[in-house]
Every structure is written in C-alpha cells, then in structure tokens.
C-alpha cells in the first residue's frame, strides 16, 4: 500500500477537475462528495486523529475541508515554508538583502538550498538568524489565524506545527504576488516524482515536503499548491500512518 500522502493530491485532483466552479471565492463548506471521499480514504488507510491531519482549499470555488487540523504534529521540514516566506517578505520590504550572509552562505543561496534541496544546516542558520527559538516561533505566528490561546505550548518548545497553520501559510503564499515568484519556482523544482508529485504528473506542484524518522516515530508530510485549472492548496501531516 502506498503512503497516503503520496495518493492524496491525485485523489483530490480527480474531484477538482469535474467540480463546476462557484461564482464566489469566499470559503465554502466541504461538499458531500468531498466529505464522503475523505471518509472513505481515511477508512481505507486506517487514518485517525492520532496519525493524520489534513487541510484542503480550492482557490476558485472557496471549498475548504479540514480534518484534525489543529492537532500539533511533528512538522519535519515543512517548517521551512513560513521561514523562507518571511525572509522573502523582508527582502521585498528592503529590510534585508539577498546578498546578506546567513551562516556560511548568502540569503539567495540559502533560499535555494532550503527550498529545493531541503538543506537542514542552512535552514537552521536561517532560523537562528532571527534570534532564539522562541523569537523565531513568535515571528512565524503572524501568518496564522489561530488565536494565541489555542496554540499548544509544544509549538514553542519544538518543531511542531498544525495543518491549519500550514494552510494559512499557503494562502498567504498563493495570494502574495511577485515577491514570492522565486520561492514558488524553487518549490516547483523540489523532489520531482515524490510526495504529492508521485501520481500528479500533468500539473505543476509547488510543495514543501517533510520527512522525519527518530525515536520510533515516522512523520511523512507535504504542503503545497497544485496548479490545476482550479488550483488547490493542500497540507497533510502524518505520524506513523499505515502505508
């Protein structure tokens, strides 16, 4: 059985291609078709609130589906999504230069290494260039709609995020205009034929994936923009999920 992260983009692609666009783009509740599709998918893979979290958003119809989206889980390398986005915004505002040294390399190269190759050492240098770990986590919160009182303390202590936060980040990225063109291009280059890209070959995908194995825990995650005729945003976290 293939891991669920690798099948989800293709599964939702099929639904998106035959959905008739709505006139408005405000957030809409999930259709009965989408809800049933996701229920069947979870049952097939043995997915539950202990091992699976998902957020889906259709940028054309506004349809949104969430499952277990506020559960904080090991983010693996998906933390690099809001981290890089923040630096691109600082560059656009003239607050930092792409030639600024981040550790042993320039910020321009750090973006490439972090987003295309998911270089951990470079990304950690980017993180601590902002200050200590708490400062970095507080800085990232500007992209999230989750109220402070709902954010679990583990968020501040370790590399934990939730898919609700990742969906907020993807929305900001998708709607952010020219300042994110390079970032999206790098995300399109990353990991061809893997994660969301395994079964979706006819449409571009800009994604930031994450893979973590340690202490008996395996996290396989992906977050991205799938550029179908109705582009959709997808964030999926797993923890020891079957497949």
Model feature map: region roles:
Residues 62, 72-102, 114, 234:
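Active-site SXXK
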Residues 1-9:
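Bacterial N-terminal signal peptides that target proteins for export
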Residues 18-29:
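Sec-dependent signal peptide cleavage junction
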Residues 11-19:
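Bacterial N-terminal signal peptides
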Residues 76-82, 117, 158-164:
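Aromatic- and histidine-enriched alpha-helix N-cap/loop-to-helix transition segments
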Residues 95-117, 137-149:
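Active-site helix/loop module of the DD-peptidase/beta-lactamase fold
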Residues 28-61, 65-66, 122-243:
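Penicillin-recognizing serine hydrolase domain
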């Amino acid at each position: 059985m293939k891991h669920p992260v690798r099948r989800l983009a293709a599964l939702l692609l099929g639904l998106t291609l035959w959905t008739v666009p709505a006139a408005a783009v405000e957030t809409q509740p999930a259709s009965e078709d989408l809800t049933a599709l996701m229920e069947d998918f979870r049952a097939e893979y043995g997915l539950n609130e202990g091992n699976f979290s998902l957020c889906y958003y259709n940028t054309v119809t506004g349809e949104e589906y969430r499952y277990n989206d506020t559960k904080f889980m090991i983010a693996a390398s998906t933390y690099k999504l809001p981290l890089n986005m923040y630096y691109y915004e600082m560059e656009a505002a003239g607050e930092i230069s792409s030639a600024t040294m981040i550790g042993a390399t320039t910020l321009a190269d750090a973006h490439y290494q972090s987003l295309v190759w998911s270089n951990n050492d470079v990304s950690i240098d980017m993180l601590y260039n902002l200050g200590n770990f708490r400062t970095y986590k507080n800085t990232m919160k500007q992209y999230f709609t989750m109220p402070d009182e709902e954010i679990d303390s583990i968020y501040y202590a370790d590399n934990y995020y939730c898919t609700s936060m990742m969906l907020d980040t993807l929305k900001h990225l998708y709607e952010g205009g020219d300042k994110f063109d390079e970032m999206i291009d790098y995300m399109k280059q990353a990991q061809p034929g893997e994660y969301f890209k395994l079964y979706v070959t006819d449409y571009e995908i800009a994604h930031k994936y994450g893979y973590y194995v340690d202490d008996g825990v395996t996290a396989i995650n992906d977050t991205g923009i799938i550029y179908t005729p109705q582009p959709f945003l997808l964030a999926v976290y797993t923890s020891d999920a079957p497949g």
